[in-house]
Design a protein with these regions (language model features):
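A short, N-terminal "cap"/entry segment at the start of jelly-roll beta-barrel domains
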Residues: 1-69, 169-175
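A short beta-loop-beta micro-motif enriched in histidine and acidic residues
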Residues: 64-78, 93-94, 100-101
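Short, conserved beta-strand element in jelly-roll/cupin
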Residues: 72-89, 107
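A structural preference for long, well-packed, hydrophobic secondary-structure segments
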Residues: 75, 88-98, 115-116, 134, ...
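Conserved metal-binding segment of the jelly-roll/cupin
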Residues: 100-120, 129
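Double-stranded beta-helix
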Residues: 117-175
Length: 175
């Protein structure tokens, strides 16, 4: 994608602290990329699947975002918004409201609480994870084992939007 919007993208950065029962991830920020995928084609979800495949984050599903707070301890997650618009809550109850639209991407580090507050009828998301990671669906406070899993989860080798050397690889660094 030489010269593409995705290649030149700079994300919005959202740092989330623990919030009630939602652990979030104090070391790794949420990254939100705006308008990085052209969704004017016949199958915009396929454009996200192709992008994520090229950048080493194989796409796993097409659907939406659950309407309840949840987080993952066993996977970092990228959400590609292929159609419609939505208002999400990131970080758990009373967290940060984020509006997303077709063409946007959100990268959620393990532990990040997220839920859909409202969405247009055509809202469609492509979800992907780094190789070797599979999401669990957590809706309660983390046990010590769950917290250790979040802290020890390997960092992705590439940014799901820009690939090797993309913003994630510099913004997500071990201390």
């Amino acid at each position: 994608m030489p010269g593409s919007t995705a290649e030149a993208a700079r994300p919005e950065i959202l740092e989330l602290r623990p919030n009630g029962w939602v652990p979030n991830n104090e070391r790794l920020p949420v990254l939100v990329y705006r308008g990085v995928v052209d969704v004017s084609g016949r199958d915009p979800a396929a454009a996200f699947e192709a992008l994520f495949g090229r950048t080493g984050w194989p796409a796993r599903w097409r659907n939406g975002v659950f309407p309840y707070h949840h987080y993952h301890t066993a996977a970092h997650e990228v959400l590609g918004f292929a159609a419609g618009r939505a208002r999400l809550m990131l970080g758990g109850p009373d967290g940060a409201e984020v509006e997303v639209a077709a063409g946007d991407v959100a990268v959620l580090p393990a532990g990040t609480g997220h839920r859909r507050l409202e969405a247009s009828g055509d809202f469609l998301v492509v979800g992907a994870y780094p190789p070797g990671q599979s999401p669990d669906n957590c809706r309660d406070a983390p046990t010590p084992e769950m917290a250790a899993r979040i802290a020890g989860l390997p960092y992705p080798e590439s940014d799901p939007v820009s690939g090797q050397g993309g913003p994630l690889t510099t913004l997500w660094q071990r201390p």
